[in-house]
Structures are given as C-alpha cells and as structure tokens.
Amino acid sequence: GVDIAKSINAHGAHVGMDDIPYNQARKILGRKSIIGVSASNKNEFIKVKKLKGVDYIGVSAFSSNTKKEMKNYFGLSGLKNCANATKIPLIAIGGINISDVNSILKLKIHGVAMISSLLKGNIKKNCMDVSKIISSYEKI
C-alpha cells in the first residue's frame, strides 16, 4: 500500500497494525502526506493515539454481525470514549448501517467508512442519503 501510494503520488495511505509500521510509512511518504492508522481494539487505540503526526485513526469495528466478533467492537460508547481521549480525527469503520451515521457523527467522529450498507438495495439512494447526513455536519 505505502509503496504504491508513493509510486503514484497519492495524497497519502492508510496502514493497519499488520502493515508497514507508521513511522516507516511516514519516512517513505513524507510529512505532507496524509497517513491514517487502524485501531481494532482499545489497546491498539491507546498505542496509535500516542504516535506523533498521525493524521487520522480508523476505529474498527463499530458493530459486529457475528457473535465471534462481538467482543471486539466499539459501539457508540466506545467511539465516544475514543473521541474524548484524543484530538486526532477519527473515522468509524465496520458494520455501520445508514441508520447509525447520524448517531456516530453526533459524537464528533470525523467520518465513516461504509461498504455493505451502501450496496444493499438502491445504491444511488443509499449514497445520497448518507451524503445528506454527512453534509449536515460540515462546517459552513
């Protein structure tokens, strides 16, 4: 990911805990690049928020569809705790339904990353609905 981002002059990259370390990604891409880092649980979040210069944290998963994953999701209360613990912009990821977006953004979460709920049913309508919700939070 980071090598590809560099080779195509992308604005940045996102790295997970199993990817290239953040500090190495920053050296490769430079200070002006946008670099986000994933946090899949509370301990990872604590580590990531201490990294100097992280542009955003991808907090996942918001919710879960399986019992196996239930113990690892953040939910609204977990996202609220994360938002209160850092000034780094947060992006909620994983298991987000359109009906969740407003509640998530009310917590001062900076954005949502969604796939499945957008692709169910009328894709265009779903995207427009989410866009409308997000637009209501943008600063004028």
What do these predicted regions represent?
Residues V15-Q24, G58-M70, V101-I133:
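Glycine-rich phosphate-binding active-site loops on the catalytic face of alpha/beta enzymes
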Residues G1-I4, D19, K42, S63, ...:
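Conserved beta-strand edge residues that scaffold enzyme active sites
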Residues D3-K6, N23-R26, I46, K80, ...:
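Alpha-helical segments flanking ligand/cofactor-binding loops in enzyme cores
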Residues K27, K49-G53, L105-K108:
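Acidic (Asp/Glu)-rich catalytic clusters
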Residues M17-D19, Q24-N41, K71-I98, V130-I140:
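Alpha-helix-loop-beta-strand connector modules within alpha/beta enzyme cores
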Residues K6-V15, I35-N84, I123-N126:
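Glycine/Thr-rich beta-alpha phosphate-binding loop at enzyme active sites
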